[in-house]
Design a protein with these regions (language model features):
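Short His-centered aromatic/hydrophobic patch
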Residues: 119-121
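Short hydrophobic beta-strand segments
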Residues: 7-12, 116-117
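A short, glycine/small-residue-rich beta-strand->loop->alpha-helix junction that serves as a flexible
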Residues: 13-22
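Glycosyltransferases and closely related glycan-assembly transferases
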Residues: 101-115, 124-136
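Active-site-proximal region of nucleotide-activated glycan assembly enzymes
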Residues: 131-181
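Conserved N-terminal ligand/cofactor-binding loop architecture of enzyme catalytic domains
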Residues: 24-105
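Short, well-ordered alpha-helical microsegments
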Residues: 19-20, 123-126, 143-145, 163-164
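Positively charged, low-complexity intrinsically disordered leader regions
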Residues: 1-4
Length: 181
């Protein structure tokens, strides 16, 4: 039957080719199901504070990634622990939630009831903070990390083990056992 051209917004940050590919895949799938996908790149608004923060974080992450490829000690002592354990902690997510609020003005003229798929947690968090009512947070990683949580959205994952890890908030607070979502 299809969606008869109903709109769906694909929210993204175009942070690296991987996130761009995920966004293109979501837009393509939506189109194949009969939706009209609209691309919302939160990093593309030149003067918006939220966009500037995303671009700065992207630059910082890219720099860290390049250094980690060239300097083994940096990779072992800083980069790997940050990416495997630092982003996993629930406390890390709190700062991202505040940063996402800076993107709320970008949603000012968007109908809050249009279905929305965030292909990174920041667009998902921003959409929730902006009052969007049908937000899907497409989680790209199978390693459960609090970085990927967007409270108030529907979280999608790729595997049963990822589902269990996110459902149980596995390892997101090393000091205590968290209650399942």
């Amino acid at each position: 039957e299809g969606a008869n051209g109903s709109p769906v917004i694909v929210g993204n940050i175009r942070m690296g080719f991987g996130h761009y590919r995920i966004s293109m895949a979501m837009a393509s799938a939506a189109h194949a199901m009969g939706y009209t996908p609209y691309w919302l790149d939160l990093a593309s608004f030149k003067d918006a504070t939220g966009s500037k923060v995303i671009r700065y974080q992207n630059d910082l992450y890219s720099k860290g990634s390049r250094i980690s490829q060239r300097v083994g000690a940096f990779n072992k002592l800083v980069w790997e622990p940050l990416n495997s354990e630092g982003f996993r902690k629930l406390s890390y997510n709190a700062a991202d939630q505040k940063n996402a609020e800076l993107c709320v003005p970008l949603f000012h003229d968007i109908d809050k009831d249009i279905p929305y798929v965030g292909t990174h947690v920041w667009p998902s968090q921003a959409a929730v903070h902006a009052g969007m009512t049908h937000v899907v947070n497409a989680i790209p990683d199978n390693w459960p990390m609090a970085l990927h949580l967007a409270e108030g959205s529907i979280h999608t994952v790729q595997t049963p083990s990822a589902y269990l890890g996110y459902h149980q908030l596995r390892g997101m607070d090393p000091a205590r056992q968290l209650k399942p979502m």
